[in-house]
């Protein structure tokens, strides 16, 4: 692995980050640094807290489309007009088959469903799928099931699964991307899950027209909530979504690879001790620059995403190996 010698200014930021003494202004001001400095600071923090490993996870879109919520970025929302496959909850046999297909590569497998929440019958079937995966694979199981009540959270705690619930963006900016539910609804679920002792993965999407300050506010909320894993996504605008139209009209500017990498670095510096995982949109935004994100990250989502294709898994494994990291 490469050796880094930080200059005095970068060393000061590194030390403040390591001792978690950076405030919002400090983090926003990081945007003024060049990318190389941010990568050097981030890599130094990664080596300090999370070593040289890249943890791999995969997801399955187990129920697709016709979502009641009006998130402007989501191709599964019935308020958008994206042409995607729609289907009800997959059978436990199909879910298990999908899990087994990635077991060789992934450490975690997440069952993801569209919609604000799940019905009681869907939840019962998902619990059965969790048991199947736990009994027949070595995978750790995660679920992304929307806004869950206490009884469902308790049942998931008994199965020792990790809950995923993205905040998506800052509280201040949330109304610009969704009005059918509130930011606080997500916060309440995360707080209740943490109270019950469930592991929590949460994060957001960079590139939806938000400011750098909004990105920092999101990161500071994740820090305050003490989530276990931070899932970062880069907007891949899908035809038929309202955000796609906003980008095409020039209302929003699509995030570029430099801004994306700088944002990921700021996440590392804001949350030095957390698992930072890069998920959807990395292929679309970063392209050949993906390899540099490994200096910042602790994890990658591999395989396909919800309604878009991911990079070939073998290409990801080769990239990790060539950059000198371990799985």
Swiss-Prot record:
Record-listed E.C. numbers: 2.8.1.6
Protein task: Catalyzes the conversion of dethiobiotin (DTB) to biotin by the insertion of a sulfur atom into dethiobiotin via a radical-based mechanism.
Alphabetized UniProt keyword annotations: 2Fe-2S, 4Fe-4S, Biotin biosynthesis, Iron, Iron-sulfur, Metal-binding, S-adenosyl-L-methionine, Transferase
Domain Radical SAM core: 49-282
Cited PROSITE patterns: RADICAL_SAM
Residues that bind [4Fe-4S] cluster: 67, 71, 74
Family listed: Belongs to the radical SAM superfamily. Biotin synthase family.
Protein name according to UniProt: Biotin synthase
Subunit description: Homodimer.
Record SMART domains: BATS, Elp3
Annotated cofactor note: Binds 1 [4Fe-4S] cluster. The cluster is coordinated with 3 cysteines and an exchangeable S-adenosyl-L-methionine.
Catalytic activity, reaction form: (4R,5S)-dethiobiotin + (sulfur carrier)-SH + 2 reduced [2Fe-2S]-[ferredoxin] + 2 S-adenosyl-L-methionine = (sulfur carrier)-H + biotin + 2 5'-deoxyadenosine + 2 L-methionine + 2 oxidized [2Fe-2S]-[ferredoxin]
Signal peptide, first to last residue: none
Molecular function as annotated in GO: 2 iron, 2 sulfur cluster binding; 4 iron, 4 sulfur cluster binding; biotin synthase activity; iron ion binding
Gene: bioB
Residues that bind [2Fe-2S] cluster: 110, 142, 201, 277
Cofactor: [4Fe-4S] cluster; [2Fe-2S] cluster
GO biological process: biotin biosynthetic process
Enzyme class: transferase
Pathway named in the protein's UniProt entry: Cofactor biosynthesis; biotin biosynthesis; biotin from 7,8-diaminononanoate: step 2/2
